[in-house]
């Protein structure tokens, strides 16, 4: 099985530097262009199904990438970005004085501290691992397109490669790029990370 990883295009919150876990934030014109470029780069990729986050920025990206295809799509909450709740659509500069104690604790120990009323890293990790455990349900597929978010995709790569969850920072998944992981008999290999090349059949 090959997993094709695509991060949603640039959003207004990305440009403003805001935390945007589940909060709605539309693609910018640049983000729309990134998704349309991926449509061209991946035109010949033989996707059997697409697994997508519930969030509109990911779904919009998926629609643009797959324009003209009738690829079956599954919307999965496990692929949603980490949920910041009270910190949604806020800048870290504001949190340093508006929610100083919680934000300082999170900066000091991000693996165990929890954003105010939000989803902590441990819960987020368990959610992404639930998604990994569900991949077996798609064993009839050779090529799965996964459209999601930076945090999810970085953590997905780390855990599939049997690395600790905290290793996600080693894998920055860029917007406007595609990546692939091959899984054979339960062993995952990162084949491509952040390609901007046209995919051609091997």
Curated annotation (Swiss-Prot):
Active-site residues from the entry: 8, 81
Pathway(s) where this gene product acts: Nucleoside biosynthesis; alpha-ribazole biosynthesis; alpha-ribazole from 5,6-dimethylbenzimidazole: step 2/2
UniProt keywords, alphabetically: Cobalamin biosynthesis, Hydrolase
GO CC field: cytoplasm
Coiled coil: none
One BP term from GO: cobalamin biosynthetic process
SUPFAM superfamilies cross-referenced by the UniProt entry: Phosphoglycerate mutase-like
InterPro entries in alphabetical order: His_Pase_superF_clade-1, His_PPase_superfam, PG/BPGM_mutase_AS, PGM_Phosphatase, Ribazole_CobC
A molecular-function term among this protein's GO annotations: alpha-ribazole phosphatase activity
Reaction equation(s) it catalyzes: adenosylcob(III)alamin 5'-phosphate + H2O = adenosylcob(III)alamin + phosphate; alpha-ribazole 5'-phosphate + H2O = alpha-ribazole + phosphate
Entry EC number(s): 3.1.3.73
Matches recorded under NCBIfam families: PRK15004.1 (NF011580), ribazole_cobC (TIGR03162)
Membership in a protein family: Belongs to the phosphoglycerate mutase family.
Role noted for this protein: Catalyzes the conversion of adenosylcobalamin 5'-phosphate to adenosylcobalamin (vitamin B12); involved in the assembly of the nucleotide loop of cobalamin. Also catalyzes the hydrolysis of the phospho group from alpha-ribazole 5'-phosphate to form alpha-ribazole.
Protein name, as recorded: Adenosylcobalamin/alpha-ribazole phosphatase
């Amino acid at each position: 099985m090959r997993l094709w990883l695509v991060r949603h295009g640039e959003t207004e919150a990305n440009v403003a530097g805001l935390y945007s876990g589940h909060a709605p934030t539309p693609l910018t014109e640049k983000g729309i262009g990134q998704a349309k470029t991926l449509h061209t780069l991946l035109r010949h990729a033989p996707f059997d199904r697409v697994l997508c986050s519930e969030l509109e920025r990911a779904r919009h990206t998926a629609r643009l990438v797959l324009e003209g295809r009738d690829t079956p799509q599954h919307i999965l909450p496990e692929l949603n970005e980490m949920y910041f709740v009270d910190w949604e659509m806020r800048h870290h500069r504001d949190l340093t004085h508006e929610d100083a104690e919680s934000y300082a604790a999170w900066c000091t120990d991000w693996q165990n501290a929890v954003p105010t009323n939000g989803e902590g890293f441990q819960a987020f990790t368990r959610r992404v691992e639930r998604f990994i455990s569900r991949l077996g349900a798609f064993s009839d597929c050779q090529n799965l397109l996964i459209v999601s978010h930076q945090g999810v995709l970085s953590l997905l790569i780390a855990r599939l490669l049997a690395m600790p969850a905290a290793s996600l920072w080693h894998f920055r998944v860029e917007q406007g790029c595609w990546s692939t992981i091959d899984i054979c008999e339960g062993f995952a290999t990162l084949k491509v990370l952040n390609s901007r090349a046209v995919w051609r059949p091997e």
